[in-house]
Amino acid sequence: MSGKDNKGSIRFEIQNFSGLAKATEHKPVQIGHVEWILGAFTSTSDATNNAKHLGIHLKCNEELRSNLWSCDASIRFSLLRLNSNEDDDAFSMEFQQKFDDLNKIVVVNNFKNWEEAICYDNRFVLDKHAVLEVQITVNKIAGIHERIIETFDQPKEHLTDVVLVLEGKHVHVGKQVLATSSQFFQKMFYSNFAEKTQAEIKIDDVTHSEFIDLLNVIYPTHMLINSSNVSHLLKLSDRFAVPRVLEKAETFLILDQKTHLIDKLKFAEVYRLSRLQNACLSQLETSEDVTALKHHENYKSLDHITYNALLQKLIDLLED
């Protein structure tokens, strides 16, 4: 593992910090080839001498069920002082921690006294929000192999023969690889389009980093589809006609337990994912399950085609 790959940080901005009650978590982040989740909560217990404290936790590979892995890491938790020009102006704690199947989380119940955390003079809270940060250095891992993710920023002899330009950045790819996976690129490279003979081809209205994710799923790298990239992978695989990536993203959503059913139904609706819609409808086992969906904030964003499917599901349940 390179020194660059084994270090990283998670910066977690918490809105309405003074109203923090139940635990809140940042989305998963990959550092050192393992998945990390930073969370914050308030705690009043014997561990805090019955005084309210800001608590903080860090989860490592929470979803991994294997017992064949371990991770030794150096961790630095920080509550940042806002409106400060000093890089090290923060309240911090440092730990050395070994994570494995039986120890996936480190919890600090008494990270910072609550009154001190929200005190205006201490400058931890600005405009009702605060910022937590964890810096992670993965010192040693076992049972987890390095994932090779390409950046496509350099040409490779015999493997790349065209340059795509996105947001002013060069992306070096092979025509045959893209044409094999994508009808869009097959037509671009091998039909009577002007781009056929161009050494550089500009791709508009696409975020560079998101397109790199798409390429890493098309190419035989080790990019995993997750809750952070599934949305733009669906969008781009639909735009560029890459059915294999669309199918992989659909399979991820079918198996994913974190994405809400309403959001899954919306994805299914937009990208015509019949397997995903069927899986969602199959999870609705009672009429109450169906009617409860209307309370979700994104329920009204659904189109009539999904409403019709939900109505038919409700009718079927009531008739049983």
Curated annotation (Swiss-Prot):
The gene is bath-36. Gene3D superfamilies: Apoptosis, Tumor Necrosis Factor Receptor Associated Protein 2, Chain A, Potassium Channel Kv1.1, Chain A. Residues 160-227 form the BTB domain. This is BTB and MATH domain-containing protein 36. Residues 7-136 form the MATH domain. SMART domains: BTB, MATH. It comes from Caenorhabditis elegans.
